[in-house]
Every structure is written in structure tokens, then in C-alpha cells.
Amino acid sequence: MHCLKLTTLNCLRAATLLVAMAALLLSGHTFAQQPTAGLNPSAQELLDRGQELLLRGSYLAAVEVYSRVDDDFFRDQAQLGLSRAHMETGQYAQAEAVLQRAAEEPADHPELATRLAELYVKTGRSGQAEALLAAVVDGQLNPPVRTLVQYGLVLTLRGDRDAADVHFNAALARYDGGMVFESADVAMVAVAARQLDEFHDANALFSEAVRLDGNNLEALVLWGDLFQDKFNDQDAQTNYNEALEINRRYAPALVGLARIESPERNLSRALDANARNVAALQTFGERMIRNGRDEEGLGFLRQALDINPESIPALATLAARAAMKDDMDEFERLRQRVNAFSPESASFYASIAEFLGNNYRFTEAVEYARRAIDRDPRNWHAHTVLGGNLVRLGEEREGKQHLEQAFDNDPFNVLTSNMLQVFDVLEEYATLESEHFRVNMSQRDAQILWPYMEPLLEDSWDRLVAKYGFEPEVPVVIQVFERTEDFAVRSVGLPDIGPLVGICFGKVVTLISPDTLSANWQEIVWHELVHVFTLQMTHNRMPRWLSEGISTWEERQGRPEWGRRQGLDLIRAVQQDRLLPVGNLNDGFTGANSDADLSFAYFQSFLVVEYIAEQYGFEDLLALIHEYAEIRDESEMFANVFGVDMATFDAGFRAWIEQRVADINVYVHAEDSPDEGEGHGHGVRENSSAILAELYNNESLKQYMLGRVQREPRDFQAHLQLGIVLFREQAYTEAIRHLRTAHELLPDYTGYPSPSLVLAQVYEAMGDEEAQREQLAIMLEHQQHDFAAPMELAEHALQVGELDQAAYYVERALAVNPYRPEIHRIGAELASRQGDTQRTVLEYEVLLTLDQNDPVAARTDLAQAYLDNSQPDDARMTVLRALETAPTYERAQQILLQAVEPSEGD
């Protein structure tokens, strides 16, 4: 660890002149003696003005000002400023012309030569850059700090890390020796520290550089890049924004910010400032390819490589794309292209691995991450990529080893740290196994959830194996997290994952515990299990739209009440022309700007799958799945299965949608808001009608909605709103009329509140319990996320002796919330009346975990259940625990006597 001498600013300023003079004496480069008259005030003013214009992003004006400096004494400074102004606008040839004289005698003009070398690197001439910097270093006793660091970066790029480290260490030694004072040089020392894996030092040095000069845009952005490299987006964003407050056209800051927020807007701004900014072009290209917009992405990458043929990120993106398509000839061509200037580049392989992992190609990602580590065992990013992808393949032990190795050497990487912390969480979890599954969940969930999840998993397995004719690799690993943050970190490495509630990686599934949800957890499990099948069937090659579309379509196949019914959203999307072409469906996921957009992407994908199932049949859907197991163009796959090209298929889908909208035949007002909910359909979606009723005067709202239904009798939302308003006014007859009309218009509506739910409330207010229960039952035909309604119906069915009905509604309630004691009391009573002693035991065991209000009664009930199920030893031990607390409890004493009688009789 290098010593950091954070000398106070005042001391630094006091020492600057003396040390600078000493440095000049030591340097092999000395300025010619100039007479006092040579200090041309007008030239200095021009330099200051040019610097100010550069700082504020007025690059063309800066070019004009710097071009007016004609004093030889300031020539190097003017050319540095002029070249930078040209470079900031992508005028690399003009910048090179300005700097060209440094190429002849680089040691005499070290700053110019260093800037020229940086330009060579930007334009894909690292060999020339290496030679130029070598000449400066060899020709100078004390070459500039920037020269040392840039030389190290070039040597690193060209694969000579050991030689690079020599120059990075020289830069740090210069700082430790008290010979670095300027903000720009301190920032370069920070870069050297970062390259030497001294991340704490790098952070402190960047901080010092910015403290010395708050306008050092380069330092602000390089510091932000360090944060972003460690997945600390919050601090990175702060740095980029600080730079942009000074210069809103500073392209490096815009590119950095684009990786965090508003990517297309910020990248477009960067390219407006510099249309030849390779980082912006490469980032845009990678984003487009990741979103399935290959032609656009390839165009950006070609532009980047035309400017810098040695851009490893651009070449790695193209190579990763080739690997995903199994085009190994193209991959090898790209690899050899990289090898020509950076033999077996570790960063090249690590970038490929990261790209593949982000596209769910975990097996291939592991392969390339290993190659990166073989080339450079110090590439801690590659260790993190390898560890994360191994975990997603279920290879947790080896994955953890690589994550630990990365963390030990780079403890500031938030992603690595987060993933390791989840291992600590999992160590406290129970590990449960069934025939085909290995499940990690909290001790609480192991007692409450597992008894209901295990049979669901195995039953679902049998059904899906029979349906798809495929058996996934076992065991399938399922991890159920109590904390949303742990679920997010295990899934993507960072604690913010939005409203997702489950993720499948093919062999591993992560879920949020139902204890933190208000949704049907069984539907979620089924949805994710379908992913296990389709992803493994296609070796994780299936696009997201089809994978999500099939899983969403299968929801309704799993249970009649499951699935998404978004008729209003469909009509609204058609009205707004929001339906994407089938070939661009992945854009709906990657380009979503809100949860509502993402929810609709799921819904449209489901509609395409439903169209296939209805128009072509399940066998053709299965054939399409198998097509994705091979590497073909998507249009060829569709032609093979459906006998039509993508355009014809899309036209057929749109005609089907138009007919579906016509069949729904409901008016949707432009002012109505779409239903909103969390979990991308896995949960209640709230209708704005209830909110409107709270916000607005009943009479004015009623008159407005009456006007709407008079103009458009099939205005579902207006009828529903009128029903709510009239119910609040206790005008029950009129409320019922409008609510029944709303239900008839859209009988499968699942938003909250639905017409049937409000009708149930109306009948409850009228004292008509039978009609109330009838409406609750109607609501539950299409609403899988409600707990109160099935509970009420189960209690009534139990009271009147309709045990099958009671059992159905008990299961419906358990599917939403197995953590409420009352459902287990009803379940225990039901099981007892059905003579199912084993189920009675289960319900009382769970109830004992949940109900801490009266543990004596809970243990006594459980003891009786054990006794009835021929488990006298368990009954005796349980009732003794009850008697420890209440030794005179007569019922417990009687159960104890019954429990010990058989053993005494023996």
C-alpha cells in the first residue's frame, strides 16, 4: 500500500514555486531563456480565455482563441489547448496536425508528445503511441507524471502489464516523494493507483485532485468511472452531474451518465458534442444489440471501429454477438484482430463473458471468464463475472470462491460485496429437498410455506414434463428470500430490482417470500417453473419476449383463475398504436420507461403466444421452442414453423388483435388512467375509480360520468365509477344497475375494485348475504390475489357443511397468504371434519408457529391432532410443553392420559 501524503492546500501552494523550479533544473527538458518582454500579456489573456471556453464547452470558440496565440513562449500551451478543443469535437486529424511537431523531438515537447500519444490511442494506433511515449520516458530524467501513466496504460492495452506496473509505480513514487502538486497530475497518480489495484488510494487521490481544482472535469469523470466500475452508481452519478454542471457538453461525463440513467438521451447529447466519441458510439451499439436492434447496433459499432480499430469494448461486443450466434469463424477473426495489438486480452474475454451472462448464456459466460483469468489472474472483474455466473448455474461453492477472491483484492466492488453477503444470509436458511428440487428458505418459511410449496412443485413438475416432453436438469435450485434486497442482490447483484418478484436463470430460481407479497405465490412459482423448462429446452437461447410470453400464457393453463386479463390495456394500446411488431418484442422489455410499460410488454408477449396457441396449436408453439435451441435467424424459425415470413405472421397477429378488440367491444376514454400494480401482473392492479371517488365531489363526479355513459353506453370505467358513487350515496338500486352493466361489459376484469367486488359490498350493506357471497364467488373466478373473499366463502361453506367448497376456498386463500393464523384454524377444522388426520396435524403445526397469543391452546390442539394421527409420542411431548405453562389445564391432562395409555398397556 502506497503512503498518501495528503498535505494541506496552503502548504502545497507555498511549496509549488520552489519545487517547480527544482523540477525544471532536474529535467532534461529546459525552456530557452526568455526576456521579460517575452511574457506577452495578451497571449496570457488568450490562453486564459481559451481555457475558460474549453471548460464551459464552447469548443469552436476555444479553437478560434487558441489559434490567435502567436507567442513562441506560450506555443506549447496554446497547442495543448487547441488540440484538446479539436479532440473534444472529434476533429482528430486537426488535433494531430497541431501536435505533429512533437513527433519529431518528443523529449523536447513531452506534454505535446503525451497528448499526441493519447490521440494515437483514441484512433487505434497504440503501437505508435507506445513508441512515442517510450521516446519521452527515455529522453527525460523526470518525465511528466501524465507521460508515465499514459505509457503504463498503453503497455497495459498492449498486454505488457508487468512493464506497465513499473511506470504506474514510478508515478506513485513521484507523489510519495512530494513532487506532485497540480490537480491534473494528482488525478493521473490516482489512475496509476487504480491500475495497481490500490483502490482506496485511488479514491483518496481523486478526492485530492478535485479538492485542488473543482473544475478538473477529467478528474471528476475518472473518479466517477472508478465508482461505476465498483457498481457504486450513486456516487458516480454525483460526479458526472458535477462535471455537467460546469460543462453540459462534456462527452465523457454524458457517456458515464448514460450507463446509469436515460441512456439514449445522454448518448445522443454526447454525440451532439462529439459525433466521433468512440465510447458513446460503442455504448450505443452495445445497447442496441442487447435490445435486439442488431442493424442499428452494428452501425454504431462500425462507426466506433472506423475511428478506433483497437476499441476492445466494441470488438468484444461483436465477438460476444458472434459467440451467441455460434459463428465461431467470425469470433476467431475478431479475436485475431485483438491479438494483433493486445495478445489474449483479459479485458476482451471478461467483456465477452459479461455480455453473455447478461444475455442468460451462463455456461458460455463461465468459459470466457475463465479464459480472462487464465490470461490475467489479477483481473478481479473477471473473477466477479465468473463467480456470479457460476452461482446462476447452481455451482455455488466455486462461485463463492471466485467472489471471495475478487473481494479480498477489490473490497470496494459493491456487486461482489453484495453477492457475498447473500451467502451469509443463505447460511442461516434451511435447505429442503424433494425429488426434483433443492430449496433454500428461511427457518420460518420452512415451517409455514414448505409444506404447501413442496406438493405444488412436484405436481407442477409432473404436469410440465408431460406437456413439454422434456425433463430439466435436477435438482432445480429454488431460493426464497425474506428480504426483497437479498432477493435482488442474489438475482442481479444490486439491491434495487424494481417490482420483480421472481427470476429464473434456467437451473436456478430466485423468489421473494410470499410473506412480503400481496400476490398469489403459487402462480408465481408456476410461472418461474415454466421458465425452467423453456430456458433449458433452448439452452437459454430463447428471447425474453417468448420466454415471458409462454410463462404468462401458462399461468391461465395452470389454474383457471390465474393469468392476466388486461382488456382495457389492450384497447388503449391499439388506440395509441403501441403494439410492437413481433420481431421487435424484446424492445418492449429493454425500452420500458415505467412499470406500466414493462407490464404491457409481458401482456403483449402473452398475446402473441396465445395467438400461436389458438391459430396454430400447441404443437407449433412447441416446435417454435425447439427452433430456438438452434442458431438461426428468427425469420427463418417462423418460416420453418408457421410457413410464413415475419411480416405475414405479424399481419395475422394484428388482424387477430383487431378482432379481439372488437369482441371486447368496450369504450375506453382517453382521460382514464391504466390500472397500476406491482409485480408485473403478479398482484392486485388498482383502478383509479376508487381514488376518484375519494378526491372529487360525489355530485359533480356523478354528473360527469352520467354524461359519459349517455354519450358512450359501453364506457366500462364510467359505469364502474357511477356504481361506486351511487353506492356511497346509498342509492343501491341504481348502483347495482351500473355495476351489473360494467360486469356484463367486461366480465373477466381483474382490477381493484372490480364490479363484482363493489356489488358484493352493496349487497352486504343491504343485508343480502347470499347475493354478497354470489358476487364474491364471481369475482374469484378471475381474481387470484384476494385473501378476504375466499376466507369468507370458506367459513360459510364450512358452516353449512359444503366441505368440498370449503376445501376449494381454503386452498385459494393459502395461495395468497399462508401466514395468517385464521386460514390454518379453518383448514384444521376442515381437515378434521374430512377425517384427514395428517392434514389436521399439518395445519396445527403451522398454526403453532404462527399463533403466539395462546401457545397453550395451540400445543394442546396439536397434541390432539398427533393423537388422532397415531403419533402418541409426539402428542405426549407436545402436551407436556403445554402443561409446563398451564399445569392445571384439564383438556391437556386428558390428552396426556390418552397419549400414555398405549405404552402402559404394553
Predicted regions and their residues:
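Juxtacatalytic substrate-recognition/specificity segment
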Residues: 104, 131, 139, 204, ...
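Beta/coil-rich, acidic/histidine-enriched accessory regions frequently appended to metallopeptidases
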Residues: 34-37, 45, 51, 55, ...
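Amphipathic alpha-helical substructures
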Residues: 329-332, 392, 397-400, 542, ...
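Helix-start (N-cap) detector for alpha-helical repeat units in TPR-like alpha-solenoids
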Residues: 43, 76-77, 110-111, 144-145, ...
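Structural signature of tandem alpha-helical TPR/SEL1-like repeats
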Residues: 57-61, 89-98, 124-132, 159-170, ...
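Canonical tetratricopeptide repeat
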Residues: 81, 115, 150, 185-188, ...
